[in-house]
A protein has these predicted regions:
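Conserved long alpha-helical elements within nucleotide-processing catalytic cores of c-di-GMP signaling
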Residues: 11-34, 41-68, 78-82
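Glycine-rich ATP-lid/hinge loop adjacent to the conserved G-boxes
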Residues: 74-76
Length: 85
């Protein structure tokens, strides 16, 4: 599957394939590639204190918020792993 089971957004495997494809296109066409990666500050502390159910909900909410903010056809939102997007 190309989707993350928890958040429903693109998973790391699909992200890696997409980045490879975009990188090759950028080299071929001499165009830039932009990449933003982030994690959730203090997520481990939150997850440990509030529980995994709350942590999962947090990850889902972040995925939804970021997906809602990205609207260009060539953009991709992916969960890289853990709390990294």
């Amino acid at each position: 599957s190309c989707l993350d089971g928890l958040t429903g957004i693109t998973n790391r495997r699909q992200f890696d394939d997409f980045l490879d494809q975009e990188w090759r296109r950028a080299v071929r066409e001499s165009t830039p590639v932009s990449l933003i990666m982030f994690d959730i500050d203090r997520f481990k502390t939150y997850n440990d204190s509030k529980g995994h159910t709350a942590g999962d909900e947090c990850l889902k909410q972040v995925a939804t918020a970021v997906t809602g903010a990205v609207n260009r056809p060539g953009d991709l939102v992916a969960r890289y792993g853990g709390d990294e997007f």
